[in-house]
Amino acid sequence: MNEQLINRTMAFAGILQAIAQVQHLARHGELDNAELAASLNTILVTNPDNTADVYQDKIVLQKGYKLILNQLGDSSQKDVEITRYLVGVLALERKLVRSNSGLGMLAERINQVNRQLHHFAITDEQVIANLASIYSDIISNLGPKIQISGNPVCLQRPIIQQKIRALLLAAMRSAVLWRQLGGKRRHLVFARKAIVDTAKKSLTL
């Protein structure tokens, strides 16, 4: 398999996995802590030696590959809401990479969170609040806000709002990596088969 395509598909799986977690949280108000940690940890790996270093929880990544099969394959399980969130994340990513000040602030704030992890777990409410504020302060204002649908009772809870923003930041991190690896929106139309085939093979590794 083409190594660049493998890495790009891995990053795309990371985007979809974080987006699916946003959807699940918005609907049900809860998320497995290990899965939450796996997505949030990707934000903090800013200088990886290789793409696999960003996605260290392979079980969670498998879910991302399955989402690729659903969203880009011939499956009847395409989720319009996931597609809408994906379009929103990719649009904000384009705005972010064109903003030198935004990228600089992002790196600085992520370093602050890394220091905070000397004292707290990444799923601690204080850390999640900081990650959420990074998204609100730097990303959210770059373009149209992503409108999250779900259970109003869940969406009114501050901790759920913060987890959703933190997960959107994780989706953004994977989107930036996907673009750095050569990912383009047109690939999702014209190179779907190659992406789906790579996801299938990655699932069986």
Swiss-Prot record:
Keywords: Cell inner membrane, Cell membrane, Cytoplasm, Membrane. Gene3D superfamilies: HflD-like. Signal peptide: none annotated. Transmembrane segments: none annotated. InterPro entries: HflD, HflD-like_sf. GO terms for cellular component: cytoplasm; plasma membrane. It is found in: Cytoplasm; Cell inner membrane. It comes from the Bacteria. SUPFAM superfamilies: YcfC-like. It is a peripheral membrane protein. HAMAP family: HflD_protein. NCBIfam families: PRK00218.1-2, PRK00218.1-4. Belongs to the HflD family. This is High frequency lysogenization protein HflD homolog. It comes from Shewanella baltica (strain OS223). The gene is hflD.
